[in-house]
Amino acid sequence: MTHQTHAYHMVNPSPWPLTGALSALLMTSGLIMWFHFNSTILLMLGLTTNMLTMYQWWRDVIRESTFQGHHTPNVQKGLRYGMILFIISEVLFFTGFFWAFYHSSLAPTPELGGCWPPTGIHPLNPLEVPLLNTSVLLASGVSITWAHHSLMEGNRNHMLQALFITIALGVYFTLLQASEYYEAPFTISDGVYGSTFFVATGFHGLHVIIGSTFLIVCFFRQLKFHFTSNHHFGFEAAAWYWHFVDVVWLFLYVSIYWWGS
């Protein structure tokens, strides 16, 4: 903050947006190579560069916020607005998937047999793994709230316990989802039902993995005493994101698994 007459953070030039964009290009190109040519080399390269970019960018943000004091109240306010806008954009992203699902299911075309689920599709039982997944995510919503309140009260041990439980539940959800995909009696290529089901639930699963990664970073930061009861926006943003993931799943469960079956 030396030689500065304002409370805002002037970010130094960083290579990570460029490497992040390149890793995204490599991953999307790698997916095409994997789908069409059964080659995972480009995809693995993209994932590796993405992981390296995430690690180093997160490291820089932690340095700037925790050790250099750049995250003043004004900067934190801007970050909060940014996170809110990001979550709104994610809501609109998922709105597109729900629109596709309801557009197809509320007025099934003759090609689908005039019914929903389409003729020949055997949907998953919503009272089996999907209901367990719902319980797991709802429980994780409770534990992340417990972690947040413990942090605000300065109870470090309870915060760590609650955060660990949330991460464990997030990983468990991902494993359950993977087993459900493996055992599903239909695939992404089974018409509009398969494509809307796997794209909507798959993108939600990706968001759970991203949210779990965010929480794991917060867990290690808390182990190193990075958060205080009044300076913990990194954790707060992760908690907001996790609640968003939780709410989206409830809509997915009610729409696609329960009503759609």
Swiss-Prot record:
Signal peptide: none annotated. InterPro entries: Cyt_c/ubiquinol_Oxase_su3, Cyt_c_oxase_su3_dom, Cyt_c_oxidase-like_su3, Cyt_c_oxidase_su3-like_sf, Cyt_c_oxidase_su3_a-hlx. Its EC number is 7.1.1.9. Disulfide bonds: none annotated. Residues 35-40, 106-128, 184-190, 257-261 are mitochondrial intermembrane. Keywords: Membrane, Mitochondrion, Mitochondrion inner membrane, Translocase, Transmembrane, Transmembrane helix. It is found in: Mitochondrion inner membrane. Residues 1-15, 67-72, 153-155, 224-232 are mitochondrial matrix. One of its GO terms (molecular function) is cytochrome-c oxidase activity. It comes from the Eukaryota. The keyword Lyase does not apply. It is a multi-pass membrane protein. The chain crosses the membrane at residues 16-34, 41-66, 73-105, 129-152, 156-183, 191-223, 233-256. One of its GO terms (biological process) is mitochondrial electron transport, cytochrome c to oxygen. CDD domains: Cyt_c_Oxidase_III (cd01665). GO terms for cellular component: mitochondrial inner membrane; respiratory chain complex IV. It is an enzyme of class 7 (translocase). It catalyses: 4 Fe(II)-[cytochrome c] + O2 + 8 H(+)(in) = 4 Fe(III)-[cytochrome c] + 2 H2O + 4 H(+)(out). Component of the cytochrome c oxidase (complex IV, CIV), a multisubunit enzyme composed of 14 subunits. The complex is composed of a catalytic core of 3 subunits MT-CO1, MT-CO2 and MT-CO3, encoded in the mitochondrial DNA, and 11 supernumerary subunits COX4I, COX5A, COX5B, COX6A, COX6B, COX6C, COX7A, COX7B, COX7C, COX8 and NDUFA4, which are encoded in the nuclear genome. PANTHER family: CYTOCHROME C OXIDASE SUBUNIT 3, CYTOCHROME C OXIDASE SUBUNIT III. Belongs to the cytochrome c oxidase subunit 3 family. Component of the cytochrome c oxidase, the last enzyme in the mitochondrial electron transport chain which drives oxidative phosphorylation. The respiratory chain contains 3 multisubunit complexes succinate dehydrogenase (complex II, CII), ubiquinol-cytochrome c oxidoreductase (cytochrome b-c1 complex, complex III, CIII) and cytochrome c oxidase (complex IV, CIV), that cooperate to transfer electrons derived from NADH and succinate to molecular oxygen, creating an electrochemical gradient over the inner membrane that drives transmembrane transport and the ATP synthase. This is Cytochrome c oxidase subunit 3. It comes from Eudorcas thomsonii (Thomson's gazelle). The lineage of its organism: Eukaryota, Metazoa, Chordata, Craniata, Vertebrata. The gene is MT-CO3.
